[in-house]
């Protein structure tokens, strides 16, 4: 569940970055590279594609090192791991109040944006084109994560159908308890 919570917080932080450029933000699409360094200094690198649509829909499509899809809509989280032929379904007890969280990001003199969500501080960076470039944070387990975004598209049309998961026939569906 900590992993699912981390995905929600990263997406929330990403939305916070985008909000700083205006209230008309409706969607984001980007390729990403995520590097998580544990307390022992051992890095794990992930890459994939993310799409998000306000107020609370997101799909993480991990390509490497293993394929994984994560769908989020409000407080519902679905994680599909094709290699395991398994779908995990859960509901988070606390769904994010996106407007309040988005408004909490504060611009610092160095041009970065900082916010704190559930005791975790997020540092948000933008590029010269005023698009989100990077998010850095250390989670409650001491894992330092850097999320680098590339090929960022803002406010493009994204069909709601892209956020609907239909489980393949024969996969195991595991219901996880709410957190």
UniProtKB/Swiss-Prot annotation:
InterPro entries: LolA/LolB/LppX (IPR029046), OM_lipoprot_carrier_LolA-like (IPR004564), OM_lipoprot_carrier_LolA_Pbac (IPR018323)
Recorded superkingdom: Bacteria
Origin species: Helicobacter hepaticus (strain ATCC 51449 / 3B1)
Protein's recorded name: Outer-membrane lipoprotein carrier protein
A GO term from the CC aspect: periplasmic space
Leader peptide range in chain numbering: 1-22
Keyword Protein transport: yes
Localisation: Periplasm
